[in-house]
Amino acid sequence: MVKSDYYEILGVSKNADEREIKKSYKRLAMKFHPDRNPGDVSAESKFKEIKEAYEVLSNPEKRSAYDQYGHAIFEQNSGGMGGSNTGGSDFSDIFGDVFGDIFGGSRRSRSRRGSDLRYDIELSLEEAVKGVVREICVPTLVTCLQCRGSGAKSSASIVSCVTCHGHGQIQMRQGFFSVQQSCPSCNGHGKIIKEICNKCRGSGRIERTKTLSVKIPAGVSTGDRIRLSGEGESGKNGAPAGDLYVQVQIKKHPIFDREEKNLYCEVPISFSMAALGGEIEVPTLDGRVKLKIPPETQTGKLFRMRGKGVKSVRGIGGHGDLLCRVVVETPVRLSDRQKQLLQDLSDSFGGPYGHKNSPKSKTFFDGVKKFFDDLTR
């Protein structure tokens, strides 16, 4: 696989000075850092390229060798700088000495922040529209109070690593270069635990279920995530905790359907009200309101009730609307007298095919007649 040019990776010219290289490196490293792009494999790969490029271009001797011989100078002598550094070692250990000035790891292996957690919460439509405060119970890993996260039985149980003399790094020679690598004895921490904590068995963390109060803002939708910073798993060796992401799922409502900020519902009306008009009560999430039905209303007609929908979760654009779709019901279980009255009404229309009072029916049957007339020509 052909490697990309280190100058192109950092976006600098070959004449760039140390300040320009460092500035570009910091900007790109912050952008593609795995902590900012959890689960993004392409970002992690880019991050490795950036760190590898900076490791070479920030060192005058390595940069001079690269300018003369390119990547080949690092691919000789047991894999050199380019090949050996990515082969199975821990990602943060490989580049810890390069990355310390940005992310606070000095030249020792950087303690990893705790893992992020996800909690799925199911809300009613009313809770999603108006907002709610919910208590949730989340199983997680918290810092062991007995050892305060150190993993040691006592402070006397923590001793300096004899391999690296407490530095967390050891010098390795590769070809004619001398490079630093994470100490294999202490994993880059510079300290070794002689006796582990009997509470957490040396991990520095224990399992606990935390009860948290979560404020759900008004207007959330299915798929929205609410981030609770620092409420994920505790980090090891005093590293910061991860975050908790509360994933919203909204239950199906028996009356309303939702589409972004608008609500929809079907409202049944009688045949007589559709013809003569009237007033009915319709439900909203704030209670019942009156809706005026004009005469000659057809089934399927939409009536918009402004401001009776869902509030924007970001407070932009105000509330949505409630759209009521009327459905004209055909009367059932008619008495003999009612049947006769309807028959008389039908006769007054000119029979079942009288079109004077049914404009849509007239248009339909006129179209049918024309269709068959065209067939017989």
Swiss-Prot record:
CXXCXGXG motif repeats lie at residues 144-151, 161-168, 183-190, 197-204. The keyword Cytoplasm applies. Residues 5-70 form the J domain. The keyword Iron does not apply. A zinc finger (CR-type) spans 131-209. Participates actively in the response to hyperosmotic and heat shock by preventing the aggregation of stress-denatured proteins and by disaggregating proteins, also in an autonomous, DnaK-independent fashion. Unfolded proteins bind initially to DnaJ; upon interaction with the DnaJ-bound protein, DnaK hydrolyzes its bound ATP, resulting in the formation of a stable complex. GrpE releases ADP from DnaK; ATP binding to DnaK triggers the release of the substrate protein, thus completing the reaction cycle. This is Chaperone protein DnaJ.
